[in-house]
Amino acid sequence: SMLSRRFIIGFLRENLVRKVSRLRFDRVISTVDTHTAGEPTRIVVSGIPRIPGKTLGEKMEYLRNELDFVRSAIMREPRGHNDMFGAIITEPTTPDADLGVIFTDCGGYLTGCGHGSIGVATVAVELGWVKATEPSTIVLLETPSGLVKADVHVQKGRVKEVTIRNVPSFLYKPNVQLSVPSLGDVRLDISFGGNFFALVDASQLGMKIEPANTERLIDVGIKIKNAVNKEVKVNHPLLKYIDRVELVELYGKPTHPEAHSKNIVVFGVGQADRSPCGTGTSARMAELHANGKLKLEEEFVHESIAGTIFRGRLVEETRVGRFKAVVPEITGNAYITGLNQLVLDPDDPLKHGFLLKASSH
């Protein structure tokens, strides 16, 4: 049966290759699919045009304005889904960086992403883009929010886990009181961890962070996100193009025995992070530190709504413009789930993807 199986696979492969070469596709996009603590990252490695730009911020704008169909095709149905997440690999624009990375979701682009950085760094070492050294291989990623240093822990040639050193994070606006339609008054903190987050203690809404409440938490998160962007102006003091609260992090009591806090991060068009969220963990640690609740080098274990964990700690204090800031490190695991050739058929009316959910939020 082994022989016949090999014969069948060989036969299929030969005929498929012959057939495929006769097909005419608009694009063949190669991706490496991964997940970090349950949250996907579909990493685009080839099949898209060169992305010009003197900075990663400019490259992100070019993608948004000229190549947005790539993002929608690979993130949305039928190839992706409402909660899909991705990373587009580009040439870096700073000499030290190994790779440039721009993060994508169903709704648009993100300037920074912890789980995605862990996924990209894992793939860079597992697939030999960066030469593996044991016990530690450094991969330097350039993102639109700055340089992210990934320390990839390698054992017997395999990646065990990744510690990323994120961009300086800071509490931006503490104690914001907001009147949110159909929710009433909500108290929140605005904190930066690579993106701007609204941090919300879910207990004030009488809600627990648990899978059964996912839909309701997403609904509440999007309402808060919309209200915050209507009422509060935010602007990163150094990176002027970061000027919106992109994510809402609702937090509560943990269920994992090692965790200090449990959260759900809501973003995009009502997407929920399955991982504890690296930039969200950074933003939360910055807020805790500013309020005297987390010391430098003290471990902070963060649990996701799916029950997976990231381990975080703050390694130094610094400044960002007029803000006191901290440098966070996040440790987590990513695994490769697939090597994909995604094709865009010129005759397919849905070739650029579709979403059912966009209209409801």
Task: For the regions a language model picked out, list residue spans one by one.
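N-terminal chloroplast transit peptides
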Residues: 2-11
